[in-house]
Swiss-Prot record:
Originating organism: Salmonella typhimurium (strain LT2 / SGSC1412 / ATCC 700720)
Matches recorded under PANTHER family: GLYCOSYLTRANSFERASE 8 DOMAIN-CONTAINING PROTEIN, LIPOPOLYSACCHARIDE 1,2-GLUCOSYLTRANSFERASE
Cofactor: Mg(2+)
Reactions performed catalytically: UDP-glucose + [lipopolysaccharide] = UDP + D-glucosyl-[lipopolysaccharide]
Name of this protein: Lipopolysaccharide 1,2-glucosyltransferase
Pathway entry: Bacterial outer membrane biogenesis; LPS core biosynthesis
Motif (DXD 1): 127-129
Protein family membership: Belongs to the glycosyltransferase 8 family.
């Protein structure tokens, strides 16, 4: 195959409650499956609460409920913004690799970069587990005329091992995290990068991609990016709370300068067992969104069941932790 799989838009909805001039709008996109939709809604709310600039949001997903559509419409009305919802058919993506942790929804950003290049010149892509706590206004003035994207380098634990996995590409020191990417869509399209990404994903090197979409973006954009400072992608894993009995060390990472918090790892701020001060920014945004009365999410995957019982025990919920541990062991033994 020599081109990116054709992805059909099955349904398109737009809720426009803004008075935006398209020339000065910060366009922001998300690409998710149904398990991350609520996270997207709260992420959008967090952006709006911290920014008084023209905004337009694009959500690309393969499934959604009528309830989600209703809440997205409420969000647009509540904050006077424009939200476009793209329901896509993804059968053609079955040829691409996926992992136990990441579904093929990780490729939706590649579709977003390609499809939205027909509509807008620049696009900020955010993962659904990114929460905003500062101003994004400077991105509107960022000069991307000679670079394809603006990104933030990944953390040292990932950075220092990248050449072991991708030795042929010499990415160490410049490897970036793809959870926050500000893209020059004109140059993306001119360089046919979606097509090139697919060729890499379907090629012989694919087995070495631990983070398929992120690895491919790093390979294609090597020496073609501007590096933004850490506040634009402040990576924090809630797993670190298991070792921090004070639950205060997060403030060494998430601080007054932080603009975007990226909650990486299996435990997300919307999980029922993520009861820590470090997720207050997510909770504040949720309380100012249509999802304010939604219950926190329970464990769904075997990995989440494992994380749940560990966090409950650390929090001193011993009985609940033992029950959760039993539920994890049961699934581990009988639901392989």
């Amino acid at each position: 195959m020599d081109s990116f799989p054709e992805i059909e838009i099955a349904e398109y909805k737009v809720f426009d409650e803004s008075n935006n001039n398209d020339d000065n709008v910060l366009n922001i996109s998300y690409g998710v499956d149904e398990n991350y939709l609520d996270g997207v809604g709260v992420s959008i709310a967090s952006v709006v609460l911290n920014n008084n600039i023209p905004l337009a949001f694009h959500i690309i997903c393969d499934s959604y409920s009528p309830c989600f559509v209703k809440y997205i419409e409420r969000l647009a009305v509540q904050h006077h913004i424009k939200i476009s919802l793209y329901l896509i058919k993804v059968e053609s993506l079955e040829v691409l690799p996926q992992t136990k942790v990441w579904s093929r929804a990780m490729y939706f950003r590649l579709f977003a970069f390609d499809y939205l290049s027909k509509k807008v010149n620049t696009l900020l892509y955010l993962d659904a587990d990114v929460v905003c706590k500062g101003s994004l206004q400077d991105l509107l003035q960022l000069d991307l005329t000679e670079k394809i994207a603006a990104v933030v380098k990944d953390v040292d634990s990932i950075q220092n091992k990248v050449n072991e996995r991708l030795s042929a590409f010499n990415l160490q020191g410049g490897y970036f995290n793809s959870g926050v990417v500000f893209v020059n869509l004109k140059l993306w399209k001119e360089n046919a990068l979606t097509k090139k990404a697919f060729l890499l994903l379907a090629g012989k090197e694919a087995d070495s991609f631990k983070y398929p979409d992120q690895d491919v973006l790093n390979i294609l954009l090597q020496d073609k990016v501007i590096f933004l400072p850490r506040p634009y992608n402040t990576i924090y894993t809630i797993k670190s709370e298991l070792k921090d009995k004070s639950h205060k060390k997060y403030s060494n990472i998430i601080n007054d300068n932080t603009i975007l918090i990226h909650y990486t790892g299996a435990t997300k701020p919307w999980h029922a067992w993520a009861n820590y001060p470090s997720v207050i920014y997510y909770k504040n945004a949720r309380l100012n969104s249509p999802w304010k009365d939604f219950p926190a999410k329970d464990a769904r995957t075997i990995v989440e069941f494992k994380k749940r019982y560990k966090h409950l025990l650390v929090q001193g919920h011993y009985f609940k932790g033992l029950l959760a541990g039993s539920a994890y062991l049961y699934r581990k033994l009988f639901h392989k």
